[in-house]
Amino acid sequence: ALAMNVGAYGQEILNVVEWAEVVEDGGGVRRLERWEIEGGYRWSVLGVGRVVTSAELALKADDPAALKARAQQARERRRGALPPEPSAGSVFRNPPGDFAGRLLELAGCKGMRCGGAEVSQRHANVIVNPGSATAAGVRELAAGMAVRVRERFGVRLELELKILDRNGKVVADPEAALARKPPVW
């Protein structure tokens, strides 16, 4: 959550982080203060060569009934927009000035399948696991989705999911996540 600066409805988790303790690439432990933690839409320095082990969040006190009501509203809103099947959430980041889900839907991605993974019928930017999805299936499906959008709209979608290559490095380009040409859809 901290590494990707998760957020919803105009809020991001980095807005409330006071500090985070991380294990760095070399194995050293370091505490980063708020002013050292840069981030933006779906990224933060906490996710670059680091693993977050603990953090302090500065949450605001509010009336418990009001908090419960807001939480319930958010759950209902998400329940209406996101599929009930198991998923990893949004596949792609929104491109500037548009929505990945809109482009994917217009490109005809809903219902696409590969390796047991399937693009949700409810939200085109979500790959669901109806029961037998494989990592390779998710990777190939994401690449196929990105190809469709690029070919139809000239927009290169950027992964929000973290896909690792064989060396454990994050692959940002979904088309490059494939060792071979994407399947024909």
Give the residues covered by each predicted segment.
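Phosphate/pyrophosphate- and phosphate-bearing ligand-binding catalytic cores of soluble enzymes
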Residues: 23-140, 144-185
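A gly/ser-rich beta-alpha-beta helix-loop segment of oxidoreductase catalytic cores
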Residues: 1-18, 87
